[in-house]
Amino acid sequence: MALYRDEAVVLRTAKLGEADRIITLLTRDHGKVRAVAKGVRRTKSRFGARLEPFMRVDLLLGEGRTFDSVRQAESISAYAGGITGDYATYTAASAMCETAADLLPAEHEPAAAQYRLLIAALGALSRHLHDPQAIALSYILRAMSLAGWTIRLDSCVVCGSQDVEFFSASAGGAMCPNDHTPDAVRVPVHVFDQLRALEQGDWPQLDMLQTPDPRCENIVREWAQYYLERPIRSLRLLD
């Protein structure tokens, strides 16, 4: 069995048998990887808490037919320590990791930009640099853009007019009064401004808000669900 070393963020875990877990990882060099950690649920497991969600770890993995296997794990950044103690921060991190896992359906396909974006967002969450909801919404929009689903917010997706008053996920983003589709929803100017700031990661502007307008979350949720073809369940907990 070939061995390889990589660093990774733990996205989610699932029980396997009596003592093992399947660990879903976003790695720096190999994209999404699912690996079995044997004995990790035992009290005296050699892995300790290093394979819990939100942890950034250096791993030695063995290639397998269905799942790879975790041979060694060393902590790089214990993001979980600054995340799990606060409900809003925890749910934001959960929404981000769920998005990362669902955005990358294929395994062992390099996704270095996605990895860098996720560790930056988790680092900001763990240090409480910005509003947790804003970090999560910004991450989701930017991760989806990296995956090829860039939301259009500055002009109408039909005619290019900058007089945008509506939004439609199925149409691709902002729409003007003349060309909006029946499913489009009316969006105030300040909500479009906040969405642009979230998509661009404009933290000086976002930090002036206590938290983004609730309609920003509704639009991000609709956008993600339409293109991922499934809801981000953790995102609903941010309400």
Swiss-Prot record:
GO terms for cellular component: bacterial nucleoid. SUPFAM superfamilies: ArfGap/RecO-like zinc finger, Nucleic acid-binding proteins. It comes from the Bacteria. InterPro entries: ARFGAP/RecO, DNA_rep/recomb_RecO_N, NA-bd_OB-fold, RecO, RecO_C. The keyword DNA damage applies. The keyword Cell membrane does not apply. It holds the Pfam family RecO_N. Keywords: DNA damage, DNA recombination, DNA repair. Involved in DNA repair and RecF pathway recombination. Belongs to the RecO family. This is DNA repair protein RecO.
